[in-house]
Amino acid sequence: ENRTINYFLDDINNLQKIKPNSYDAIFNFAILHHATELDNAMKKLSDSLKPNGLIFNEEYVGPARNQCTDKQLNIMLEVMSDLPKRFQSKHHLRPPLANFRVEPTEAIHSDLVISTFKKYFDIVFERNMNGGIAYQVLWNNIEEFENPNDIEAEKWLEYLLEKDTKFSNEGKVSVLFWYSVGKSKITSYK
């Protein structure tokens, strides 16, 4: 079926442009964790899909305000201490709460994204993308790992990703990123 693609941007915290029962697809890239009224936003998104419409998400779903537990922080610090100095992050692995004055909606309800999503959408596909260690170490530190000819960088990047997968799968660190495809529970009954 030929369909015209119409797209627009809207503010997740008020969604003034969105219309009910109107969209074949919604694409979300890391905006739901900024929703101050997450339940309201999810309901509006769900209402806006046509009966066979899908929502595609790549989203931050880690701890609210990026505040991991002390136990998780210690695991991150332990893994990072294994790295040579040049690969270690110079930034806080758990950011001070004062940092959120700059962007007050950053990760405001990120820990509720998955459960709220599942309240309004049936999961068609989902995959945890981990990140509980690797993202924290690589964030603002990726340049040391970017040279494709640097064998040492490749080795330590693989090490980070292995530890990230291991500790995420064991539930010892939070999964920070989640990919999902969902179908509205509301529109699926229309």
What feature does the model see in each segment?
Residues N2-N14:
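Conserved SAM-binding strand-loop segment of SAM-dependent methyltransferases
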Residues F8, F27, F56:
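Conserved Rossmann-like nucleotide-binding pocket used by diverse enzymes
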Residues D39-L54:
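A short glycine-rich, Lys/Arg-flanked "PGG" loop and its adjoining helix->strand segment in the class I
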